[in-house]
């Protein structure tokens, strides 16, 4: 079985279904409330486990009740938590996700002890023994150290820096990544508003660009592919991008077929958007059934 480590944030999410996302001085009605695990790295790890990948996690939580809930949720998903640091007297990051009727999301939250793992806390042995490492938003020095260790060991690296890409210096981790994930806004920051893959600093590796309900595209040194996505009724888009990344990684590591990985990733993202909660990625059987219904 393929072994993948995800590194980055581990959150506890409170999802509030609202009638609309309020503007400044506005108000919205809460229709329902639920709690679940969250955090991009944790979401990817849980999604990979659901896709029958041996998934581990590098991150940190507090020793509070939310940390217990976050770890319990990941353990039940089948994620190896050996690399998760428990910070004494620390507060686990909590995110409040406001989700409107169209499934669009706004996020409020605190980082808590999310970035307590520094380069000196990394277990290099676990990285060297992995088949792949997936980086998400985290301390730039930690991301760089993990990527550097993986590169030295011949372990492939993917990176989804997320919304903080323009605010933090991820240069070393970006340079070390074999696969990059970004949405349209992040791509603009990545390519400095040029939107051109060829001739950019990243045209020697795989770049997957997520377009939400409009699907995604992937660029490689040997060609580009576009997938229009799947038509689903979006309920909650939180975690859909993480499910996309997990689906792409799981498929690409299995057979190296980038076009097939793009299709599979879109299916994972669509199925996640059709369900509530950031931790709602599908199982391998669910993805297989979804694709079979559309192409058989």
From Swiss-Prot:
Q: Which UniProt keywords apply?
A: ATP-binding, Carbohydrate metabolism, Kinase, Magnesium, Nucleotide-binding, Transferase
Q: Which Gene3D superfamilies match?
A: 3.40.1190.20
**GO BP terms, alphabetized:** phosphate-containing compound metabolic process
Q: Name one GO molecular function term.
A: ATP binding
Record-linked PANTHER family: RIBOKINASE (PTHR10584:SF166), SUGAR KINASE (PTHR10584)
Q: What does this protein do?
A: Kinase involved in the non-carboxylating pentose bisphosphate pathway, a nucleoside degradation pathway present in some halophilic archaea. Catalyzes the ATP-dependent phosphorylation of ribose 1-phosphate (R1P) to ribose 1,5-bisphosphate (R15P). Shows weak activity towards various other phosphate acceptors, such as xylulose, 2'-deoxyguanosine and D-ribulose. ATP is the most preferred phosphate donor, followed by CTP and GTP.
Q: What is this protein called?
A: ATP-dependent ribose-1-phosphate kinase
């Amino acid at each position: 079985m393929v072994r993948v480590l995800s590194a980055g944030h581990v959150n506890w999410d409170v999802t509030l279904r609202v009638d609309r996302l309020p503007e400044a001085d506005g108000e919205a009605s809460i229709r329902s409330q639920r709690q679940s695990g969250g955090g991009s790295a944790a979401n990817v790890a849980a999604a990979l486990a659901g896709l029958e990948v041996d998934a581990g996690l590098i991150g940190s939580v507090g020793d509070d009740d939310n940390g217990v809930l976050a770890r319990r949720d990941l353990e039940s998903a089948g994620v190896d938590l050996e690399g998760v640091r428990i910070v004494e007297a620390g507060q686990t990051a909590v995110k409040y996700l406001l989700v409107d009727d169209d499934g669009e999301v706004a996020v409020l939250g605190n980082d808590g002890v999310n970035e307590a793992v520094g380069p000196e806390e990394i277990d290099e042995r676990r990285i060297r023994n992995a088949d792949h490492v997936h980086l998400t938003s985290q301390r730039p020095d930690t991301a760089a150290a993990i990527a550097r260790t993986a590169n030295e060991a011949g372990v492939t690296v993917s990176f989804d820096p997320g919304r903080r890409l323009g605010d933090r210096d991820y240069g070393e981790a970006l340079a070390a990544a074999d696969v990059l994930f970004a949405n349209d806004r992040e791509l603009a920051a990545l390519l400095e508003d040029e939107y051109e893959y060829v001739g950019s600093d990243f045209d020697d590796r795989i770049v997957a660009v997520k377009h939400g309900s409009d699907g995604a595209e992937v660029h490689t040194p040997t060609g580009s592919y576009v997938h229009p996505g799947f038509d689903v009724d979006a309920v909650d888009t939180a975690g859909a991008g993480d499910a996309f990344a997990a689906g792409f990684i799981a498929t690409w590591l299995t057979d190296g077929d980038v076009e097939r990985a793009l299709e599979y990733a879109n299916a994972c993202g669509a199925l996640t958007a059709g369900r509530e909660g950031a931790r709602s990625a599908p199982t391998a059987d669910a993805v297989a059934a979804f694709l079979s219904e559309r192409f058989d």
